[in-house]
Amino acid sequence: MFCFIQKVLSGIAPRVYALILLCAVADAVFAHGALSDQVLRGFKVPETPKLVGKSAIVVDQQAAVQLGKALFWDGNVGSNGTACASCHFHAGADIRHINQLNPGQAHTANADSTAKTFELPSGNVAGPNYELKAGDFPFFRFADVNDINTLTASTDDVVGSSGEPTQQFVAVNATGVNNDQCNSELSAVFHAGGLNTRQATNRNAPTVINAAFNFRNFWDGRANNVFNGQSPFGLRDTGAKIWLAKGEKKVKAVPLALENASLASQAVAPPTNMVEMSCQGRTFADIGRKLLQRRALESQEVHLEDSVLAGLRDPSGTGLTLTYAELIKKAFNKKYWKSDATIELVKDSGQFYSQMEANFAMFFGLAIQQYENTLISDDALFDQPINDATGFPDGFTEEQKRGFRVFNDAHCNNCHTGPTFSSAASPQIFLNTAKKPRYLKLVNRDVLGEQADGFDTDSSLFDIGFAITSVAPTAYDIGLAGTDPFGNPLSFVKQYINVLTGNAKKMLDPVIVAPCDMVDPFTEDYLSGELINDKLSKSVCKGAGKKQAKIPAPEIVAAELAKSGEGRLSDGVGAAFKIPTLRNVELTGPYMHNGGMKSLEEVVEFYNRGGNLTNPRHSTTLVFFQGMSEQDKSDLVAFLKTLTDERVRWERAPFDHPELVVPHGHEAGINPLEINLAKDRYLHVSAVGSKGRTAEQGPLTSFDSYLEP
């Protein structure tokens, strides 16, 4: 994209004004892209080196996929019947609408008031077990939906996902009873009538379909690209180890570092999270102890024509013939499970585990990754062969063609770029290049928009694939500005600033930041006397690039960071979130990290008015008033629906699945398993085979179609 910066006058037309100021997220991305540049068909998921092979970790990939699919859909994984799929059963996302509200617990600046109470801008009285209505959306209300200055009501509440009740872990049952042994503690927030309800997460659940292409996962990117075999945090977690067999009776703890394994990093977070899937204090080794001797999916129907599991289906139709231990032995190298040694994972705890139990997090994460790598939706109308005469696939309506032009004219594809319609994908994917890039560009410096005070412009550092979109005030959820459990910044930019200040010798994550390859290198706006040579980018900044391989000296960095707005070292990190894919977006509501919009129409209104608030760091956002007509809005929604893969809509292979009973709010009465818990009500998800849903079942539909007025 051709980018230029200039002073502008306040009288300029808003839409033209936005176009003048917009620059590409990455310099290789252009504003008016050809449709063919975003077709996904033919793209392969980035390979995880040294993972699959006869002497590698995974020795039977198909068995690993089978194991991963079973684990993903098995309600036994959770302490109280929650599966991974409980939050991802509908086009990879969650369309439940009862007991899904979180009071805004990520709003740490207001932790003792609104972050503990439920306030919907609709005026409806909400709380635990509340059933969301269509009229509760959107969560930011405007007298004029086209005017950002007419806000009338808002909330820090979030539509999350219902998970587990508040309980302390005691023990698992290796056979028999599915639920773990746990002791209830009265929740300060999630209770009704003196009984604990299931908690709801403080962010909306994104789709897992096409997540295999993402360089990092989770809204805040904390699921590291490098999988360490135990936790989501990659090489940051220096205590993470796996166990190798050294003969029959001995094991050795060794580190693991698998690149392009963010899905595995993501997969190991929810099962031990006390809100999502676990009683507090349960470990992955405990989950292994619970599952290994059980038949996979022992209580759930498996369809006779399941595209992955049919060959392992038990004759009864319920579950598989194999136990999880047997599936692991088929899928993984025996050096990770064959030892008879017992391992005390926590010193002096007196609690010992088998090698297979101790490595269960690794088996779980990698198997889930192998399964989710198959969930690629590359057969939407958008992906069909292009008619040379029209420039569009056959079947595109005039409305959809106009919508694609609106999508480009409004610069939606500055963020929703590449074949996945997300710059959070691995750079090789979103740059749509067959040639392997010389390095992975994950940090940039650019002018993205106006300065809050007047119309000056500045350059800001930002993590590619994450954006500030003005969905809610920064204090409601800081997103990418958060830290890991070890106190380290999640953001690559914040890590880089630590390097520039001299507080760190190198990046915490194995990421190269190349100032010579930034849209706005430091040589653009720093004096030569303020700069020093950058030693860390030598491998990239060669030849002509050496002249721009300069960074500000530590004392200059300190002076800039002391300025209001951080001067020439401003960043786009606070309240930045991972840019989601737009594929199948018709089916994956509610939308945004807070789930505050029920429909694509509300999303388009949001972007048209320039967000929900005027962001104080407007130089780091691409969300501006667009001035769309009603026809433009309708056309844009029509185009977005061309990104729906009919296999996803009808749950045809590879999107078929076993039966699942999903917790969906509570009904009157006490839970028969625990006198302090409210009685669950359930949503039954039928098993579906490779041919997909029947005509009687009908297709999956949008989130708002399930809501009462």
Q: Could you tell me what each predicted segment is?
A:
Residues A18-L19, V29:
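Cleavable N-terminal signal peptides
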